[in-house]
Amino acid sequence: KHIFPLPVRGYNYSYKGTWGASRGWGGRRIHEGTDIFAGYGTPVLSTSYGVVEVMGWNQFGGWRVGIRDHHNTYHYYAHLAYFNKELKVGDIVEPGTILGGVGSSGYGKEGTSGKFPPHLHYGMYKFNGRTEWAFDPYPHLLQWEKQTKQERK
């Protein structure tokens, strides 16, 4: 079971497929995810069951949470404004667990914020025991958004 990473009712958000678009900050690289633009502080929800593997600062992603699900897919939630204070590394989460809030953190040293509009950067990575690679989350987000809206009528 999966759900959309933001509430589908009561909050405005927008997103489109930007997988592979170039990124300039911190050197040339490609966009490994989907940006979901929303108001500052909009709740960010776990899309799946999994274990909190990482919480903290990353110079690119700012305040971020990483969750590994039972299919060994790593779900990356970045640019957060804050974390759920009850959450810690090693915790088991389920779809809908609040991880934090949408923000604009990142692109600099710890605490840097406001270099871009508030949004959730959502990424998905697969690991086969040797290498990890990113794949486009956009088709999954479209499906999960539709399912979440149907379930929450």
Language-model features: locations:
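Generic anion/oxyanion-binding catalytic loop in active/binding sites
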Residues: 39, 85, 126
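Structural recognition of the beta-strand scaffold that forms the well-ordered cores
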Residues: 35-37, 44-46, 66-68, 75-78, ...
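Conserved, short, structured surface segments that act as functional micro-motifs
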Residues: 66, 91-152
